[in-house]
């Protein structure tokens, strides 16, 4: 339930679907397991997994959803070798090379032959929508997977007006300024990990861990025109994370002081515990994202189309 990696996107028009509307649309595109000759399926599952029975779980106006993708794993090297075998056999039997169309047919036939024996990989991706705060937050370390979820949601809703938020001043410039000026605003404090790039396409990359980011050694990297592309931060004595220069948020860790707020929930009541955890987590993340964006002079409503 606790998100560990975040990509968040802002709506360019207010999110107009109610919980009931969203449930109806998602229920029309539920995940189903793969058949023996199918290569992939992507659909919605219960937001609370085996403990729930709805595609949308709501808490304090935030809508939790979950997409599942199942893919058959077909090693490209195996397919390539089998195509080569068929091409060689054709040359031996007919004394000619295979055409492009024939190679494509070989690949299709081989894939169909291998699918029933292939292993499957299943990936679940949670997200929540906060209409009040005008954002959708996706629990993924991969931007591609985050955008896959957005594409699936757009497909079932017919439209999904969202976009990344981009600051006027590049994020890496602001992050570098934090170290140069030895200060951050708001409730943020520096951690002890960072990654620096040197200017130029073939510039050096420096990664530091367990190190004071205001030390003389770090200053020497900054003086050598290296800029920050990742930096460890803490927020409001509530969570730690790695901020990337595309505003992706990695390795989110909520501190015990947050988890302990739900210690009074009966651990045997799984649904109540999941509901309380989601309400707590989404509330904290909403505040966190709003305050993080403020460090870049942005708001979650910046992209809303003006009437």
From Swiss-Prot:
Segments traversing the membrane: none
The entry's keywords: Cytoplasm, DNA recombination
Pfam families referenced in this protein's UniProt entry, alphabetically: RdgC
GO BP of this protein: DNA recombination; regulation of DNA recombination
GO molecular-function terms, A-Z: double-stranded DNA binding
GO cellular component entries: bacterial nucleoid; cytoplasm
4Fe-4S keyword on record: no
Compartments in which it is found: Cytoplasm, Nucleoid
tRNA processing among keywords: no
Similarity comment text for this entry: Belongs to the RdgC family.
Function comment: May be involved in recombination.
HAMAP family: RdgC
Protein name: Recombination-associated protein RdgC
Organism of origin: Colwellia psychrerythraea (strain 34H / ATCC BAA-681) (Vibrio psychroerythus)
Gene name per UniProt: rdgC
């Amino acid at each position: 339930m606790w998100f560990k990696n975040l990509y968040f996107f802002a709506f360019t028009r207010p999110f107009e679907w109610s919980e009931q509307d969203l449930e109806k649309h998602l229920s029309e595109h539920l995940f189903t397991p793969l058949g023996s000759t199918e290569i992939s399926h992507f659909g919605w599952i219960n937001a609370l997994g085996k403990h729930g029975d709805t595609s949308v779980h709501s808490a304090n106006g935030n809508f939790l959803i979950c997409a599942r993708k199942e893919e058959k794993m077909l090693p490209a090297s195996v397919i390539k070798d089998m195509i080569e075998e068929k091409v060689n056999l054709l040359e031996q039997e007919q004394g000619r090379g295979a055409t492009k169309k024939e190679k494509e047919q070989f690949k299709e036939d081989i894939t169909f032959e291998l699918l029933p024996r292939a292993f499957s990989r299943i990936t679940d991706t949670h997200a929540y929508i906060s209409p009040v705060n005008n954002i959708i937050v996706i629990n993924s370390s991969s931007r591609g997977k985050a955008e896959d979820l957005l594409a699936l949601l757009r497909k079932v809703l017919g439209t999904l007006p969202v976009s990344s938020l981009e600051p006027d001043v590049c994020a890496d410039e602001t992050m570098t300024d934090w170290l140069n000026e030895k200060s951050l605003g708001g409730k943020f404090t520096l951690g002890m990990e960072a990654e620096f790039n040197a200017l130029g396409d073939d510039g050096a990359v420096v990664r530091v861990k367990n190190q004071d980011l205001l030390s003389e050694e770090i200053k020497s990297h900054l003086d050598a025109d290296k800029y920050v592309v990742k930096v460890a931060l803490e927020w409001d004595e509530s969570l730690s994370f790695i901020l990337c220069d595309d505003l992706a948020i990695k390795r989110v860790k909520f501190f015990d002081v947050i988890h302990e707020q739900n210690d009074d929930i009966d651990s045997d009541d799984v649904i109540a515990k999941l509901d309380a955890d989601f309400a707590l987590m989404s509330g904290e993340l909403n505040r966190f994202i709003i305050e993080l964006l403020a460090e870049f002079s942005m708001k979650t409503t910046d992209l809303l189309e003006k009437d």
